[in-house]
Protein backbone atom coordinates (compact mmCIF):
# COMPACT_ATOMS: atom_id res chain seq x y z
CA UNK A 1 0.00 0.00 0.00
CA UNK A 2 1.38 3.42 -0.96
CA UNK A 3 2.69 5.61 1.82
CA UNK A 4 0.73 8.84 2.06
CA UNK A 5 2.10 12.30 2.68
CA UNK A 6 0.30 12.32 6.05
CA UNK A 7 1.97 9.06 7.08
CA UNK A 8 5.36 10.42 6.08
CA UNK A 9 4.66 13.54 8.12
CA UNK A 10 4.55 11.48 11.32
CA UNK A 11 8.17 10.47 10.82
CA UNK A 12 9.54 13.99 10.69
CA UNK A 13 11.08 13.81 14.16
CA UNK A 14 13.24 10.87 13.01
CA UNK A 15 14.61 12.67 9.97
CA UNK A 16 17.69 14.96 9.91
CA UNK A 17 17.25 18.57 11.05
CA UNK A 18 16.47 21.41 8.70
CA UNK A 19 15.02 24.90 8.56
CA UNK A 20 11.50 25.43 9.84
CA UNK A 21 8.97 24.98 7.02
CA UNK A 22 6.14 27.38 6.29
CA UNK A 23 2.63 25.96 6.75
CA UNK A 24 1.27 24.14 3.70
CA UNK A 25 4.04 25.20 1.30
CA UNK A 26 7.08 24.04 3.26
CA UNK A 27 10.25 25.37 1.60
CA UNK A 28 8.80 26.02 -1.85
CA UNK A 29 9.75 29.71 -1.81
CA UNK A 30 13.55 29.28 -1.54
CA UNK A 31 13.36 26.27 -3.85
CA UNK A 32 11.69 28.44 -6.44
CA UNK A 33 13.74 31.59 -5.95
CA UNK A 34 17.30 30.22 -5.71
CA UNK A 35 17.52 26.42 -5.51
CA UNK A 36 21.29 26.32 -6.07
CA UNK A 37 22.08 28.80 -3.32
CA UNK A 38 19.49 27.27 -1.00
CA UNK A 39 20.97 23.77 -1.31
CA UNK A 40 24.50 25.04 -0.71
CA UNK A 41 23.39 27.02 2.33
CA UNK A 42 21.66 23.93 3.75
CA UNK A 43 24.90 21.96 3.43
CA UNK A 44 26.92 24.71 5.11
CA UNK A 45 24.40 24.99 7.94
CA UNK A 46 23.43 21.37 8.61
CA UNK A 47 26.41 19.39 7.36
CA UNK A 48 25.97 15.90 5.96
CA UNK A 49 22.16 15.76 5.83
CA UNK A 50 19.19 18.08 6.01
CA UNK A 51 15.43 17.79 5.72
CA UNK A 52 13.22 20.19 3.82
CA UNK A 53 9.53 20.05 2.98
CA UNK A 54 8.00 20.17 -0.48
CA UNK A 55 4.54 21.24 0.56
CA UNK A 56 3.84 18.80 3.38
CA UNK A 57 6.16 16.09 2.08
CA UNK A 58 9.65 15.68 3.56
CA UNK A 59 12.73 15.44 1.36
CA UNK A 60 16.05 14.33 2.83
CA UNK A 61 19.08 16.01 1.26
CA UNK A 62 22.24 13.89 1.26
CA UNK A 63 25.49 15.81 0.89
CA UNK A 64 28.33 13.28 1.15
CA UNK A 65 30.05 11.12 -1.50
CA UNK A 66 29.41 8.03 0.62
CA UNK A 67 25.68 8.82 0.43
CA UNK A 68 25.92 8.88 -3.37
CA UNK A 69 27.55 5.45 -3.31
CA UNK A 70 24.98 4.09 -0.85
CA UNK A 71 21.95 5.22 -2.88
CA UNK A 72 23.15 4.86 -6.47
CA UNK A 73 25.76 2.09 -6.34
CA UNK A 74 25.50 -0.11 -3.25
CA UNK A 75 21.71 -0.24 -2.70
CA UNK A 76 20.07 0.95 -5.93
CA UNK A 77 17.07 -1.37 -5.51
CA UNK A 78 16.27 0.21 -2.15
CA UNK A 79 15.62 3.52 -3.92
CA UNK A 80 13.07 3.94 -6.67
CA UNK A 81 13.14 6.39 -9.53
CA UNK A 82 9.42 6.90 -9.01
CA UNK A 83 7.69 7.89 -5.81
CA UNK A 84 4.32 8.23 -4.24
CA UNK A 85 4.18 11.87 -5.34
CA UNK A 86 4.57 10.99 -9.00
CA UNK A 87 1.26 9.29 -9.47
CA UNK A 88 0.18 6.01 -10.98
CA UNK A 89 2.57 4.58 -13.55
CA UNK A 90 -0.45 3.66 -15.66
CA UNK A 91 -1.26 7.34 -16.15
CA UNK A 92 -1.08 8.11 -19.85
CA UNK A 93 0.91 11.26 -19.06
CA UNK A 94 3.63 9.28 -17.29
CA UNK A 95 6.71 8.83 -19.43
CA UNK A 96 7.85 5.31 -20.19
CA UNK A 97 11.32 6.44 -21.27
CA UNK A 98 14.50 4.91 -19.91
CA UNK A 99 15.04 7.80 -17.49
CA UNK A 100 11.72 7.27 -15.72
CA UNK A 101 10.92 3.55 -15.76
CA UNK A 102 12.08 1.48 -12.83
CA UNK A 103 12.79 -2.02 -11.58
CA UNK A 104 12.82 -5.03 -13.88
CA UNK A 105 11.27 -3.03 -16.70
CA UNK A 106 14.23 -0.64 -16.63
CA UNK A 107 16.79 -3.43 -16.45
CA UNK A 108 15.23 -5.34 -19.35
CA UNK A 109 14.83 -2.37 -21.67
CA UNK A 110 18.26 -0.99 -20.86
CA UNK A 111 19.78 -4.35 -21.81
CA UNK A 112 17.86 -4.25 -25.09
CA UNK A 113 19.49 -0.99 -26.25
CA UNK A 114 22.86 -1.37 -24.51
CA UNK A 115 24.63 -2.69 -27.67
CA UNK A 116 24.15 0.73 -29.30
CA UNK A 117 26.40 2.20 -26.61
CA UNK A 118 29.18 -0.38 -26.55
CA UNK A 119 32.66 1.00 -27.10
CA UNK A 120 33.13 -0.08 -30.72
CA UNK A 121 29.65 1.03 -31.72
CA UNK A 122 30.11 4.45 -30.12
CA UNK A 123 33.47 4.85 -31.84
CA UNK A 124 31.75 4.21 -35.16
CA UNK A 125 29.72 7.38 -34.55
CA UNK A 126 32.86 9.55 -34.60
CA UNK A 127 32.75 10.05 -38.37
CA UNK A 128 29.18 11.39 -38.17
CA UNK A 129 30.08 13.70 -35.29
CA UNK A 130 33.04 15.13 -37.16
CA UNK A 131 31.14 15.43 -40.46
CA UNK A 132 28.29 17.44 -38.93
CA UNK A 133 30.69 19.61 -36.93
CA UNK A 134 32.73 20.44 -40.03
CA UNK A 135 29.52 21.27 -41.92
CA UNK A 136 28.65 23.75 -39.18
CA UNK A 137 32.14 25.27 -39.23
CA UNK A 138 31.83 25.92 -42.97
CA UNK A 139 28.94 28.29 -42.23
CA UNK A 140 31.00 30.29 -39.69
CA UNK A 141 33.50 33.05 -40.40
CA UNK A 142 35.94 34.99 -38.24
CA UNK A 143 34.19 38.03 -36.83
CA UNK A 144 30.72 36.48 -36.90
CA UNK A 145 28.60 36.67 -33.76
CA UNK A 146 27.07 33.28 -33.02
CA UNK A 147 24.45 32.14 -30.53
CA UNK A 148 26.58 29.31 -29.16
CA UNK A 149 23.72 27.97 -27.02
CA UNK A 150 21.48 27.55 -30.04
CA UNK A 151 24.29 26.29 -32.29
CA UNK A 152 25.32 23.57 -29.84
CA UNK A 153 21.71 22.47 -29.30
CA UNK A 154 21.11 22.08 -33.03
CA UNK A 155 24.46 20.38 -33.67
CA UNK A 156 24.06 17.81 -30.90
CA UNK A 157 20.43 17.15 -31.91
CA UNK A 158 21.60 16.59 -35.50
CA UNK A 159 24.27 14.15 -34.32
CA UNK A 160 22.18 12.10 -31.88
CA UNK A 161 19.29 11.70 -34.32
CA UNK A 162 21.62 10.31 -36.98
CA UNK A 163 23.73 8.12 -34.68
CA UNK A 164 20.86 6.55 -32.73
CA UNK A 165 17.97 6.59 -35.19
CA UNK A 166 19.59 6.81 -38.65
CA UNK A 167 17.61 9.92 -39.57
CA UNK A 168 18.89 13.21 -40.97
CA UNK A 169 17.03 16.11 -39.39
CA UNK A 170 19.05 18.86 -41.08
CA UNK A 171 15.97 20.43 -42.68
CA UNK A 172 14.03 20.37 -39.40
CA UNK A 173 16.66 21.36 -36.82
CA UNK A 174 15.22 24.82 -36.15
CA UNK A 175 11.62 23.77 -35.41
CA UNK A 176 12.72 20.65 -33.53
CA UNK A 177 15.17 22.60 -31.41
CA UNK A 178 12.35 25.02 -30.59
CA UNK A 179 10.11 22.11 -29.60
CA UNK A 180 12.71 20.56 -27.32
CA UNK A 181 13.40 23.98 -25.87
CA UNK A 182 9.69 24.11 -25.11
CA UNK A 183 9.97 20.84 -23.20
CA UNK A 184 13.21 21.52 -21.36
CA UNK A 185 13.57 25.29 -21.38
CA UNK A 186 10.05 25.86 -20.08
CA UNK A 187 10.49 23.12 -17.52
CA UNK A 188 9.32 24.47 -14.24
CA UNK A 189 11.27 25.39 -11.19
CA UNK A 190 12.60 22.72 -8.87
CA UNK A 191 9.66 23.44 -6.58
CA UNK A 192 6.99 22.76 -9.20
CA UNK A 193 8.86 19.72 -10.49
CA UNK A 194 9.09 18.19 -7.03
CA UNK A 195 5.38 18.75 -6.45
CA UNK A 196 4.69 17.19 -9.85
CA UNK A 197 2.07 19.82 -10.71
CA UNK A 198 0.09 18.76 -13.77
CA UNK A 199 -2.17 21.59 -14.90
CA UNK A 200 -2.38 21.49 -18.68
CA UNK A 201 -2.94 25.10 -19.68
CA UNK A 202 -0.73 27.65 -21.48
CA UNK A 203 0.29 29.35 -18.24
CA UNK A 204 1.87 26.48 -16.29
CA UNK A 205 5.24 24.98 -17.06
CA UNK A 206 3.55 21.60 -17.40
CA UNK A 207 1.10 22.99 -19.94
CA UNK A 208 3.89 24.52 -22.00
CA UNK A 209 5.78 21.24 -21.96
CA UNK A 210 2.72 19.32 -23.06
CA UNK A 211 2.13 21.72 -25.96
CA UNK A 212 5.73 21.29 -27.09
CA UNK A 213 5.50 17.51 -26.68
CA UNK A 214 2.52 17.39 -28.98
CA UNK A 215 4.62 19.05 -31.68
CA UNK A 216 7.11 16.18 -31.47
CA UNK A 217 4.55 13.38 -31.37
CA UNK A 218 3.78 13.52 -35.08
CA UNK A 219 7.47 13.28 -36.03
CA UNK A 220 8.15 10.37 -33.68
CA UNK A 221 5.07 8.32 -34.52
CA UNK A 222 5.73 8.90 -38.24
CA UNK A 223 9.29 7.67 -37.75
CA UNK A 224 8.02 4.52 -36.02
CA UNK A 225 5.48 3.84 -38.78
CA UNK A 226 8.08 4.30 -41.52
CA UNK A 227 10.49 1.94 -39.79
CA UNK A 228 7.79 -0.74 -39.43
CA UNK A 229 7.37 -0.66 -43.21
CA UNK A 230 11.13 -0.92 -43.77
CA UNK A 231 12.59 -4.45 -43.84
CA UNK A 232 16.20 -3.31 -43.44
CA UNK A 233 18.04 -3.71 -40.13
CA UNK A 234 19.75 -0.45 -39.31
CA UNK A 235 21.46 -1.82 -36.17
CA UNK A 236 20.44 1.37 -34.38
CA UNK A 237 18.52 2.13 -31.20
CA UNK A 238 15.19 2.30 -33.01
CA UNK A 239 15.67 -1.20 -34.46
CA UNK A 240 16.57 -2.49 -31.00
CA UNK A 241 13.51 -0.89 -29.43
CA UNK A 242 11.18 -2.33 -32.04
CA UNK A 243 12.47 -5.85 -31.47
CA UNK A 244 12.73 -5.54 -27.68
CA UNK A 245 10.52 -7.68 -25.45
CA UNK A 246 7.95 -6.06 -23.20
CA UNK A 247 8.34 -6.55 -19.46
CA UNK A 248 4.65 -7.13 -18.71
CA UNK A 249 4.12 -10.48 -20.45
CA UNK A 250 6.56 -12.93 -22.09
CA UNK A 251 6.57 -12.72 -25.87
CA UNK A 252 5.09 -9.22 -26.04
CA UNK A 253 6.71 -6.27 -27.76
CA UNK A 254 7.02 -2.71 -26.55
CA UNK A 255 3.92 -0.64 -27.17
CA UNK A 256 3.86 2.32 -29.56
CA UNK A 257 3.83 4.65 -26.56
CA UNK A 258 6.81 2.95 -24.94
CA UNK A 259 8.84 3.20 -28.15
CA UNK A 260 7.74 6.81 -28.56
CA UNK A 261 8.79 7.68 -25.01
CA UNK A 262 12.18 6.03 -25.44
CA UNK A 263 12.83 7.96 -28.65
CA UNK A 264 11.77 11.22 -27.03
CA UNK A 265 14.01 10.52 -24.04
CA UNK A 266 17.06 9.69 -26.14
CA UNK A 267 16.59 12.70 -28.41
CA UNK A 268 16.03 15.13 -25.54
CA UNK A 269 18.61 13.86 -23.05
CA UNK A 270 21.04 12.85 -25.78
CA UNK A 271 21.48 16.36 -27.12
CA UNK A 272 20.60 18.68 -24.24
CA UNK A 273 23.24 17.66 -21.68
CA UNK A 274 26.10 17.63 -24.19
CA UNK A 275 25.08 20.99 -25.62
CA UNK A 276 24.96 22.55 -22.15
CA UNK A 277 28.32 21.05 -21.16
CA UNK A 278 29.87 22.59 -24.27
CA UNK A 279 28.32 26.01 -23.68
CA UNK A 280 29.52 26.12 -20.08
CA UNK A 281 32.98 25.03 -21.25
CA UNK A 282 33.18 27.81 -23.85
CA UNK A 283 32.12 30.28 -21.17
CA UNK A 284 34.74 29.06 -18.69
CA UNK A 285 37.47 29.18 -21.33
CA UNK A 286 36.56 32.81 -22.02
CA UNK A 287 36.98 33.56 -18.30
CA UNK A 288 40.26 31.66 -17.97
CA UNK A 289 42.29 32.58 -21.09
CA UNK A 290 45.41 30.82 -19.79
CA UNK A 291 43.47 27.54 -19.78
CA UNK A 292 42.08 28.19 -23.24
CA UNK A 293 45.53 29.02 -24.64
CA UNK A 294 47.02 25.86 -23.14
CA UNK A 295 44.23 23.75 -24.62
CA UNK A 296 44.55 25.33 -28.07
CA UNK A 297 48.31 24.79 -27.93
CA UNK A 298 47.73 21.10 -27.24
CA UNK A 299 45.21 20.84 -30.07
CA UNK A 300 47.49 22.59 -32.54
CA UNK A 301 50.49 20.48 -31.55
CA UNK A 302 48.65 17.18 -31.96
CA UNK A 303 46.56 17.92 -35.03
CA UNK A 304 49.07 20.03 -36.98
CA UNK A 305 46.23 21.49 -39.04
CA UNK A 306 44.37 18.22 -39.67
CA UNK A 307 40.76 17.58 -38.78
CA UNK A 308 40.61 15.57 -35.53
CA UNK A 309 40.16 11.82 -35.62
CA UNK A 310 39.26 9.28 -32.99
CA UNK A 311 42.91 8.31 -32.58
CA UNK A 312 43.92 11.92 -31.91
CA UNK A 313 41.76 12.16 -28.80
CA UNK A 314 43.99 9.80 -26.83
CA UNK A 315 46.80 12.35 -27.25
CA UNK A 316 44.77 15.26 -25.87
CA UNK A 317 44.79 14.72 -22.08
CA UNK A 318 44.32 18.39 -21.24
CA UNK A 319 41.11 18.34 -23.28
CA UNK A 320 39.72 15.65 -20.96
CA UNK A 321 40.77 17.58 -17.87
CA UNK A 322 39.03 20.73 -19.14
CA UNK A 323 35.77 18.90 -19.81
CA UNK A 324 35.92 17.06 -16.46
CA UNK A 325 36.45 20.32 -14.63
CA UNK A 326 33.71 22.10 -16.55
CA UNK A 327 31.20 19.39 -15.61
CA UNK A 328 32.38 19.53 -12.01
CA UNK A 329 31.65 23.24 -11.71
CA UNK A 330 28.58 23.33 -13.95
CA UNK A 331 27.10 19.83 -14.08
CA UNK A 332 24.34 19.68 -16.73
CA UNK A 333 22.53 17.15 -14.51
CA UNK A 334 22.66 19.06 -11.23
CA UNK A 335 20.16 17.11 -9.13
CA UNK A 336 19.00 13.52 -8.75
CA UNK A 337 15.86 12.38 -6.94
CA UNK A 338 15.09 8.97 -5.52
CA UNK A 339 12.29 7.59 -3.34
CA UNK A 340 12.87 5.03 -0.62
CA UNK A 341 11.44 1.71 -1.84
CA UNK A 342 12.78 -0.36 1.07
CA UNK A 343 13.26 1.08 4.53
CA UNK A 344 16.91 2.02 4.91
CA UNK A 345 19.23 3.38 7.56
CA UNK A 346 21.95 5.83 6.59
CA UNK A 347 24.37 7.30 9.13
CA UNK A 348 21.99 6.32 11.92
CA UNK A 349 18.98 7.97 10.27
CA UNK A 350 15.99 5.78 9.42
CA UNK A 351 14.50 6.52 6.00
CA UNK A 352 10.90 5.24 5.79
CA UNK A 353 9.44 3.87 2.57
CA UNK A 354 8.21 6.69 0.34
CA UNK A 355 10.66 9.31 1.61
CA UNK A 356 12.15 11.48 -1.11
CA UNK A 357 15.95 11.69 -1.09
CA UNK A 358 17.92 14.30 -3.00
CA UNK A 359 21.50 14.07 -4.28
CA UNK A 360 22.91 17.26 -5.78
CA UNK A 361 25.90 17.26 -8.10
CA UNK A 362 25.94 21.04 -7.75
CA UNK A 363 26.61 20.79 -4.00
CA UNK A 364 28.78 17.67 -3.81
CA UNK A 365 31.00 18.77 -6.70
CA UNK A 366 31.84 21.89 -4.69
CA UNK A 367 32.46 20.48 -1.20
CA UNK A 368 35.52 22.37 0.10
CA UNK A 369 36.84 19.45 2.16
CA UNK A 370 37.13 17.38 -1.04
CA UNK A 371 37.93 19.94 -3.72
CA UNK A 372 40.77 22.38 -3.12
CA UNK A 373 39.73 25.85 -4.29
CA UNK A 374 36.36 24.32 -5.04
CA UNK A 375 34.93 27.39 -6.77
CA UNK A 376 37.91 27.77 -9.14
CA UNK A 377 38.23 26.33 -12.64
CA UNK A 378 41.40 24.22 -12.37
CA UNK A 379 41.71 21.49 -15.02
CA UNK A 380 45.10 20.50 -13.58
CA UNK A 381 43.34 18.95 -10.59
CA UNK A 382 42.52 16.05 -12.95
CA UNK A 383 46.18 15.41 -13.79
CA UNK A 384 47.00 11.99 -12.25
CA UNK A 385 50.51 13.26 -11.57
CA UNK A 386 49.12 15.74 -9.04
CA UNK A 387 48.07 12.86 -6.81
CA UNK A 388 44.71 14.33 -5.80
CA UNK A 389 42.49 11.54 -4.55
CA UNK A 390 38.85 12.02 -5.53
CA UNK A 391 36.65 9.81 -3.34
CA UNK A 392 34.14 7.58 -5.13
CA UNK A 393 30.83 9.40 -5.26
CA UNK A 394 32.39 12.87 -5.13
CA UNK A 395 32.08 13.32 -8.90
CA UNK A 396 29.01 11.96 -10.66
CA UNK A 397 27.98 14.14 -13.62
CA UNK A 398 26.44 11.09 -15.31
CA UNK A 399 24.91 9.57 -12.17
CA UNK A 400 26.15 6.23 -10.90
CA UNK A 401 25.45 2.55 -10.45
CA UNK A 402 23.08 0.58 -12.70
CA UNK A 403 21.29 3.80 -13.69
CA UNK A 404 24.44 5.57 -14.87
CA UNK A 405 23.56 7.52 -18.00
CA UNK A 406 23.56 4.93 -20.79
CA UNK A 407 24.69 7.57 -23.27
CA UNK A 408 27.78 8.62 -21.29
CA UNK A 409 30.35 7.20 -23.77
CA UNK A 410 28.57 8.86 -26.69
CA UNK A 411 28.28 12.21 -24.89
CA UNK A 412 31.94 12.21 -23.86
CA UNK A 413 33.16 11.41 -27.36
CA UNK A 414 30.83 13.97 -28.91
CA UNK A 415 31.92 16.76 -26.55
CA UNK A 416 35.62 16.02 -27.13
CA UNK A 417 35.34 16.04 -30.92
CA UNK A 418 33.15 19.14 -31.11
CA UNK A 419 35.26 21.16 -28.67
CA UNK A 420 38.48 20.18 -30.44
CA UNK A 421 37.14 21.02 -33.90
CA UNK A 422 35.82 24.44 -32.91
CA UNK A 423 38.84 25.51 -30.87
CA UNK A 424 41.13 24.44 -33.69
CA UNK A 425 39.63 27.26 -35.77
CA UNK A 426 38.01 29.77 -33.43
CA UNK A 427 38.00 31.33 -29.99
CA UNK A 428 34.38 32.16 -29.11
CA UNK A 429 34.48 35.40 -27.09
CA UNK A 430 31.36 36.61 -25.26
CA UNK A 431 30.49 40.29 -25.27
CA UNK A 432 32.09 42.32 -22.46
CA UNK A 433 30.05 42.10 -19.29
CA UNK A 434 28.22 38.94 -20.30
CA UNK A 435 26.82 37.18 -17.25
CA UNK A 436 25.26 33.76 -17.92
CA UNK A 437 23.14 33.43 -14.80
CA UNK A 438 21.53 30.11 -13.96
CA UNK A 439 18.35 28.40 -15.10
CA UNK A 440 18.25 25.23 -12.97
CA UNK A 441 15.40 23.27 -14.51
CA UNK A 442 15.71 19.66 -15.67
CA UNK A 443 19.26 20.61 -16.59
CA UNK A 444 21.51 23.45 -15.45
CA UNK A 445 21.22 25.91 -18.31
CA UNK A 446 22.73 29.38 -18.56
CA UNK A 447 19.86 31.81 -18.05
CA UNK A 448 21.17 33.98 -20.88
CA UNK A 449 22.20 32.42 -24.18
CA UNK A 450 25.93 32.58 -24.83
CA UNK A 451 26.34 34.90 -27.81
CA UNK A 452 30.00 35.05 -28.81
CA UNK A 453 32.17 36.64 -31.48
CA UNK A 454 34.28 34.11 -33.37
CA UNK A 455 37.89 35.17 -32.97
CA UNK A 456 40.49 33.29 -35.02
CA UNK A 457 42.20 30.57 -33.00
CA UNK A 458 45.66 31.34 -31.72
CA UNK A 459 48.24 29.94 -29.32
CA UNK A 460 50.50 31.20 -26.57
CA UNK A 461 53.06 32.57 -29.00
CA UNK A 462 50.47 35.01 -30.34
CA UNK A 463 49.07 36.24 -27.04
CA UNK A 464 49.91 39.83 -27.90
CA UNK A 465 47.65 39.49 -30.92
CA UNK A 466 44.91 38.27 -28.60
CA UNK A 467 45.18 41.38 -26.45
CA UNK A 468 45.00 43.58 -29.54
CA UNK A 469 42.08 41.56 -30.86
CA UNK A 470 40.19 41.79 -27.58
CA UNK A 471 40.64 45.58 -27.48
CA UNK A 472 39.44 45.85 -31.06
CA UNK A 473 36.39 43.73 -30.32
CA UNK A 474 35.52 45.73 -27.19
CA UNK A 475 35.84 48.99 -29.11
CA UNK A 476 33.67 47.71 -31.96
CA UNK A 477 30.95 46.61 -29.58
CA UNK A 478 31.02 49.81 -27.54
CA UNK A 479 30.82 52.01 -30.61
CA UNK A 480 28.15 49.87 -32.23
CA UNK A 481 30.32 49.18 -35.27
CA UNK A 482 28.73 47.44 -38.19
CA UNK A 483 29.32 43.69 -38.08
CA UNK A 484 30.92 43.53 -41.51
CA UNK A 485 33.30 46.35 -40.69
CA UNK A 486 34.34 44.61 -37.48
CA UNK A 487 34.79 41.35 -39.35
CA UNK A 488 36.99 43.00 -41.98
CA UNK A 489 39.16 44.53 -39.28
CA UNK A 490 39.58 41.16 -37.59
CA UNK A 491 40.51 39.47 -40.84
CA UNK A 492 42.98 42.22 -41.66
CA UNK A 493 44.59 41.93 -38.25
CA UNK A 494 45.30 38.25 -38.82
CA UNK A 495 46.26 38.68 -42.46
CA UNK A 496 43.33 36.62 -43.70
Task: Please name every model-derived segment.
Residues 2-94, 101-108, 123, 127-135, ...:
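N-terminal membrane-proximal hinge/A-helix region immediately C-terminal to the signal-anchor transmembrane segment
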Residues 28-47, 218, 222, 306-347:
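Conserved cytochrome P450 K-helix E-x-x-R motif and the immediately C-terminal K′/meander segment
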Residues 76, 359-387, 468-469:
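Conserved cytochrome P450 K-helix/beta-meander segment immediately N-terminal to the heme-binding cysteine loop
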Residues 273-298, 409-424:
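Cytochrome P450 catalytic-core helices
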Residues 2-13, 39, 80-91, 105, ...:
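Cytochrome P450 heme-thiolate monooxygenase catalytic core
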Residues 2-7, 12, 43, 133, ...:
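Cytochrome P450 proximal C-terminal region
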Residues 231-236, 296-316, 329-349, 358, ...:
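Cytochrome P450 fold signature focused on the C-terminal beta-domain
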Residues 94-95, 108, 264, 269, ...:
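Cytochrome P450 heme-thiolate "Cys pocket" and heme-binding signature region
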Amino acid sequence: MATTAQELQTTKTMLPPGPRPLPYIGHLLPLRQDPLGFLQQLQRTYGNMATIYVGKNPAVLLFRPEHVRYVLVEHPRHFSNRGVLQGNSEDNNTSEGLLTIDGEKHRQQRRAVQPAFHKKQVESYAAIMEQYTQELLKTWHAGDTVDMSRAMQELTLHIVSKCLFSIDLSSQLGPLSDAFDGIIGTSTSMAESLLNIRIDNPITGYGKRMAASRQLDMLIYTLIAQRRDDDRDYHDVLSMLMSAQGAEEPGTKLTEKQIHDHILTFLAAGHETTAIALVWTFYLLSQYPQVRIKLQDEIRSVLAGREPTLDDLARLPYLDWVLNESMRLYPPAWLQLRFVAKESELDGVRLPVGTMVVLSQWVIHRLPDIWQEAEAFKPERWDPANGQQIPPGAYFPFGGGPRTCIGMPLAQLEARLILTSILQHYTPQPAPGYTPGFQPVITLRPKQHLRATLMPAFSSDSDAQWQQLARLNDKAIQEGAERQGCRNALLSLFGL
